[in-house]
Amino acid sequence: MHGSVSGYLLVNAEVDSMGGVIDSGGGIGVKTSPRRTAIEKAQAELRQEYDVREERRRELEFLEKGGNPLDFKFGIATSHSVQSTSLTDQQAEHFVNSEVKDSFALTASPHGDSVESSGRPGVPTISEPNTADNLLLFDSENKSVEGERNLRHPNRQNRTSESERSSKAHTNQNTKETEDSAIFRPYARRNRSKISRDPARSSSTDLVQNRGGLATSISIRRGSVEGKGCIPEAANQKDMHTTSVSCPVFANSNGNIVPKNRVSSNSLNTKVDGEPVVRESTAGSKTSLLKDEADISYSKSSAYLPVGESGLAGEKAQLVSTGGSPKAATIAGQKNSSTQLNGLRDSTVEEESLTNRGATGTNGLESESSHANNVEVNVDNERDLYKVDKLDSDEISMQKTLRVEGLLDQTVGEMTKTKIEDETGQSTTIISECIPECEMQMKSVKIENQSHRSTAEMQTKEKSSETEKRLQDGLVVLENDSKVGSILSENPSSTLCSGIPQASVDTSSCTVGNSLLSGTDIEALKHQPSSDAVMLDTVKEDAILEEARIIQAKKKRIAELSCGTAPVEVREKSQWDFVLEEMAWLANDFAQERLWKMTAATQICHRVALTCQLRFEERNQHRKLKKIASVLSYAILQFWSSVEAEVPGELEETSLGIVKETCQESNCLNGIRCLAAGVKEYASRFLKYNNSSISYHSAALSTPDNMCDPEILDISMVDQLTEASLFYSVPSGAMEVYLKSIESHLTRCEKSGSSMQEEVDTSAYDTAGDIGYNVTAFDEDEGETSTYYLPGAFESSRSFNISHKKRKNLMKSHSARSYDLGDDLPYVNNTGGSNSSSLIVKRPDSNINAGSVPTRRVRTASRHRVVSPFGCATTGNLPVPSKTDASSGDTSSFQDEYSSLHGGSAVQKGTEVESSVNFEKLLPYDMAETSGKPKKKKKTHQGSAYDQTWHLNPSVHVEQKDHWKKRPENNFDMNGLYGPHSAKKQKTTKQLVENNFDMAIPHTGSIPSPAASQMSNMSNPNKSIKFIGGRDRGRKIKGLKISPGQHGSGNPWSLFEDQALVVLVHDMGPNWELISDAMNSTLKIKYIYRNPTECKDRHKILMDKTAGDGADSAEDSGNSQSYPSTLPGIPKGSARQLFQRLQGPMEEDTLKSHFEKICLIGKKLHYRKTQNDGRDPKQIVPVHNSQVMALSQVFPNNLNGGVLTPLDVCDASTSGQDVFSLENPGLPMLNQGTPVLPTSGAHPSTPGSSGVVLSNNLPTTSGLQSASVRDGRFNVPRGSLPLDEQHRLQQFNQTLSGRNLQQPSLSTPAAVSGSDRGHRMVPGGNAMGVSGMNRNTPMSRPGFQGMASAAMPNTGNMHTSGMVGIPNTGNIHSGGGASQGNSMIRPREAVQHMMRMQAAQGNSPGIPAFSNLSSGFTNQTTPVQAYPGHLSQQHQMSPQSHVLGNSHHPHLQSPSQATGAQQEAFAIRQRQIHQRYLQQQQQQFPASGSMMPHVQQPQGSSVSSSSQNSPQTQPPVSPQPLSMPPVSPSPNINAMAQQKPQKSQLALHGLGRSPQSGTSGVNNQAGKQRQRQLQQSARQHPHQRQPTQGQQLNKQLKGMGRGNMIHQNITVDQSHLNGLTMPQGNQATEKGEIAVSVRPDQQSSVGTTTSTDLQSKPFVSPLSSNHSQQLPKSFPGALSPSPQQQMQLHSDNSIQGQSSPATPCNILSTSSLSIAPAVAPSNHQHLLIHQKQRNQVQSTAQRVVQHNHLGNSELSKKSQAECMPRVPQSVTNTTQTASMGTTKGMPQASNDLKNIKAVGSTAVPALEPPSCVASVQSTASKVVNNSNTDSAGNDPVSTPNQGLAQKHGIKGVTQRQQQSLPSEEKRPKLPEKPTVQNQKHLASEEQPHLEEAQELSSSKPPDTKVE
């Protein structure tokens, strides 16, 4: 009861709802009519009477049964105990032991095992409803409770017991429910399964459960009421309980201790307990007998009986049931348990349930306990009994009568109830009571079977156990079981009478059914006629009486419990009761575990033994086999030696015919000898032929025509093969024949035509020269020349001629094709499987278009095929294929077979045997990637190639074909190096890869084809790859390179195109289609298409000038022309590499112009949609922030699959592909550039930033890389039209945002590289300023370019690195911070940013922190190189980036790189992946991205630094460029950094911070904290984490001051990027918290959430601070809305108090970020003035923020407003208020104390934009470090920290808090709580750090005041 207090309440409710009807399933009646009140009163009275009567009956029964009077008393007490223990059954057990030990085996540990109650025998069961009740109570608890109670109070308790039992059944049901729900759930397994687990114990527990039979009966009733849903559990447990339930005869439902039941139960109990215990039944012997039966039956179904029979009604029903119990019970049990119970539930069952509830109310604790305990078991198994009980509607009256009359009737009633209960759920229902009427009605005997029906499986178990027990006890269990089925059908009405069964509950012992049935039946029959006649009336009466009885029983039981049972029950429910139960469980568990362990040990030992035996046997077997093998080998050797000895003689003596004759003779002589002779003859013939093969070969040589056909091998070979001799070795003359055939073929080829020869010379011979393989050179001669490689040996010259002719045709059609064939064949053997991969790689290398254009792809595949044999370094790779691959062969293959995989087919044909592998691989690639034109020629080649190669392994070819088809999708190149890229941006990746490969690896010449392709790809990811691809593919790539500057075939050839053409022809030979393909791939950006004819003509013109045109003839033959295509003194493969390096500037110019065009177009399209007001629609179109976040999390690698808009998806995909492919190529710059472009492109907001990064990055990287990047970038858009076009659109979108950036990017020096990279990314390096300035492009560019150029190298480089860092979060910061809107937004801000960047440089710690963040993003500062898309390169580039752009950044990056390099590599990759998603998301909100760049520029630096974690973030904040890149790159970088780099960022951050003086400790600790925080958040929510950083960044940006809006924009991107988002958070500091809060949404939705926050000053309203969708709006708003508007929007969105920061937004309006200025002044003042105060303010701000978010917000507004004017003048002004206000106000936005602090800190840096910008900047860099480490938002606060170490520390803390807050704010959308926790954690952690920072900053305040 106590354990199931809720159950008790439920019981009361049930009693209330008992109305007249009990909900069998619900257990809660709907009626609470006045009649019920009257009924309850009457029931209470009746219950008392009935209890007394029943107790007397039970006594009589007990005595009649021969039970001890003492036992009977104990029984009563036990009844009470059982009832009270009903839930736990331990009481029942205890009482049973003391009172009815004979009856109850319950006391034995079995019960405890089954049920917890056995664990502590004396304890009232009610306390243990969970444990014992669940197990025991199912069967015994209700019985026990009621039975024991009845025993204690034979008269009063019988009735009460019954009602209690029913109520307990309900209680158990409710308790069970409660148990299931809360407390009991832990015990559910033990409670339910213990009996089930303990079938054996079930027997021993039987008595206990029998004792609990009453309880079980009650439980059964409860089960029926509770619901059949419980039946399975209950049934299982019941089955387990079955035996035990049958035992508790004394614990009759009626409450009789089973005096009579004991008699019947004695058999059961005696058998169970081992002593003849008659169930004590106070009511009388008959009742007790019935009860015994009922209990026994209930032992199975006792759990259900109580449920089925609610208190009074249950008893009556039992009594009535006793009359008609057998039938009724059986019927109910079998079907009515389900059907009748349900159907009759409303009337009888519900009544019973109500009665039970009433009884529960009356019985109170006991009933409830028993209910709770019995519920589970009873519900399942006893429901049937319950129904049976109900079956006898007259049972109630009968029970009354019986109770009044005597124990027998009561027993009958109990039996009926038992039967009903059995019907309800238990198969062991005592339905087998002998009462004829009962049998007629219910055939209750069958109720036992009902268990089977109701709980088919469990009841079956129950039945078996119960039957067993009953057989043991001599009970009628079997009979009952058999009857169950019939009873249901017979007695639906009886089931309705369940209300009566209370008495029957105790009679639930099915065992009594048969044995006691006769006796019980007599009285039951006596009452049964009346019950049958008065059945309906009885039902009503029963309901009323049951309710009254329940009330009485409750009162009595309460009294009893209070007297003895109740206290026990209460105590039972105490903690210690549960402890005891748990101990019992544990004991059982330990015992079980011991058994399990023993068993397991036994099994293990057995297995060990078996294993040892098996090993031993295996060894023996091996020995035997070895012996056999040795014998066989010896015999074979002997045989061959004997044959060899004989052969010479045979050869001399006779010919083959003679040998045959000899064999025949020997055969004639002896059969065996004949066989042996035959074998020997065969062997001798083989040897003879083998020896004579030379002559055959010579013959073959003499007839080379025979060798033409692979089918027609040398005659000698054919003879050998045709002979019986299957054993043959390669004839000794085979090589000679092969050489001769090749030579003849070469001669023929030379004779065949000058054009063909020229081709061969240029491509094949050059390659051959490189490779030094004549055959290969010959193969190169023609596309099919390679066919001669392998086939040549067998084909002889004729085949060669045929092949040559075919090749000639093919070469004419596909010069590259024939070349490819030659290449492939040589490599077939060497490269094998890798060949395909290499080829694939190569094909993509030479033609990026391959990815986009199937035909080119095919060519690429063909080239890949060639590459495969040659690797990327065709020349260097495999000697044979190398020549062909390098020059015409590969080119031809690339051109012709690019679609048709000509190389594969031609090579296959030429290769014959060897080429089969190549051909397979190549051909599949051809099939997969071949498309259009090449296929036709390929078909031609296939004719011959297939002739020779197909015959070898057509299936393999098909497989390869399929494989390649699949492969291009997954991994375009077999190597898988570019596979992913091939799939997404096959064209770009492939071209880049191939070009790089060809350029780099051909030079290497040492790299195998697969390795070469990979290496070349790695070395020249962008331009190199493109050129390499061009070189590999000969003219094609050359064409690509040559015409990057020109558009269309009609356009004049630009110098670049000419150079590229020459280079490609030099490298690839005059394979014009291949060269055209390569050229087009290279020039894809320009959308220039040079067809093969144009390339040939142009090359002829060029060569006429330089070397004469063999191009014409070469073109004619397709490959054969020996063209002065080779550049003197330049190796074949290296020309393209060289050209790539040289072409960089040209390519950059082309990229720049082309990208600017793209930007213009993109702006119109994408900018309208996304960045401008279209941004709102764009954001609306994109899914929710959560969706974006989810997408980024779910599709970190597959941005395309997101819910993002198609363009966003494409952009993300493209950027991801570019990054990845570039990454794979290993060209740090190229890859970075290319990835950056796509990455940037992925995010409209990112583009500018990425553009900036690109620009810086590319400049950082070599021009060649830029060109490669551009080529790859453009190729991807151009190459794969669907995918690439999407990419292009994305790029345009990026360009739109990046266009502004791009133009500046283009204009700025970095822009050039940016354009190289920026093509995809948007603007190049300029993107820093431009990106941040996207909206403010005009402003941003001049400032940014000036800044970006100057600052970009410095800050700009930081920005560049920031941009480059797009892959690397840090990179973005670097670029973003420096060039971000500060310069753009405010020229002075740009200067200040520069100053700050310098200050940051001065504050190397801050920058290092940034750098570390960069490290996290690895090349945030140096991301230019990092950007190239190589994460590893990012590490490499990071230092470069520093060197390139940042004098201060260099050291920053150095430490950060050093510390974060490794982290960076991993983190960058993660970030890049994440960035792709972020970019996608940001692109969804391109306006946000673009807007963000503008608004973010000031903020961008902050964002940048935030992105890079404080050090670099701050410097970027100072320089305008910094703020910008964060916008565009920040999404990428932050995405990357947030995802994984965040960890590295944090770690790097800590490292970077450590360099910072004063803040280093704080930074490190904060960084660690933040790292953990971010890591956690990142793990939980990659995007959320990014948003957290973004928010922090917003705060930082706000704190940074100037450019807050811009930074916010950037931060919006950064919101995804984490780091960048932090600066935005800072900008949002005043209202940055809003930004932060917005950031979370932005984070998921767009990288620009924070940036929107910052913009929120400009963009805040659109941002809505908290909604990423708002963010897009805010971005457009930021551009369009005035700073005030933004400020207002921001404050509205995020914080009212932030509105004052919005006011600063006005100030910022000059800088495009009013908020930043306002924040900056306040922050700066706070920073300068309040280093110490900041600590105080932070702590106070935390407190105040927590308590006074709004007030603080206002304060921050005021202070910010105040500080706004001051900021320019005195950073040291008492912006304490502002900072505090900001800090406090911030928290409103951030909704976090810590965030508020961060805001406050952030505000300080923000307050120092004009005059103190430099100091603030330097401080900001440090602060940003802290922020990043701590939390994105906090870093900006500590931006001034360099000068103010204190401030920095405080700001770091604050920023950290802010970071936490942004996370929290963001997380509210996702996981808000974790962020809050982190914030709190950070707050606690950061306090000491803040103090340290204070000390440090106080020690170096001058630094804070940078110029």
Curated annotation (Swiss-Prot):
Which superkingdom? Eukaryota
* Keyword Nucleus listed: yes
Subunit structure and binding partners: Component of the NuA4 histone acetyltransferase complex. Interacts with ARP4 and SWC4, and (via HSA domain) with TAF14 and TAF14B.
Q: Which family does it belong to?
A: Belongs to the EAF1 family.
Protein's cellular compartments = Nucleus
Q: Which residues form the SANT domain?
A: 1049-1105
* Record-level Gene Ontology MF annotations: DNA binding
Q: Which Pfam families match?
A: HSA, Myb_DNA-bind_6
Q: Which CDD domains match?
A: SANT
Q: Which UniProt keywords apply?
A: Chromatin regulator, DNA-binding, Nucleus
Q: Which organism is it from?
A: Arabidopsis thaliana
One CC-aspect GO term? apoplast
Fetch the InterPro entries from UniProt.
EAF1A/B (IPR044798), Homeodomain-like_sf (IPR009057), HSA_dom (IPR014012), SANT/Myb (IPR001005)
* Annotated Basic and acidic residues bias: 140-151, 1863-1872, 1882-1892
Family annotation (SUPFAM superfamilies): Homeodomain-like
Q: Where is the composition biased (Low complexity)?
A: 1493-1512
Q: Could you say which tissues express the protein in this record?
A: Expressed in leaves.
Single biological process term from Gene Ontology: regulation of timing of transition from vegetative to reproductive phase
Comp. bias intervals (Pro residues): 1513-1529
* Name of the protein in question: Chromatin modification-related protein EAF1 B
Segment forming the signal sequence: none
Compositionally biased tracts (Polar residues): 261-270, 333-342, 355-372, 884-898, 942-952, 1116-1125, 1242-1266, 1296-1310, 1431-1444, 1453-1462, 1532-1545, 1554-1568, 1585-1594, 1640-1655, 1662-1672, 1681-1703, 1769-1782, 1824-1844
Tell me where it mainly resides: nucleus
* Record's function text: Component of the NuA4 histone acetyltransferase complex which is involved in transcriptional activation of selected genes principally by acetylation of nucleosomal histone H4 and H2A.
- Compositional bias annotation for Basic residues: 856-866
- Which ranges carry the HSA domain? 563-641
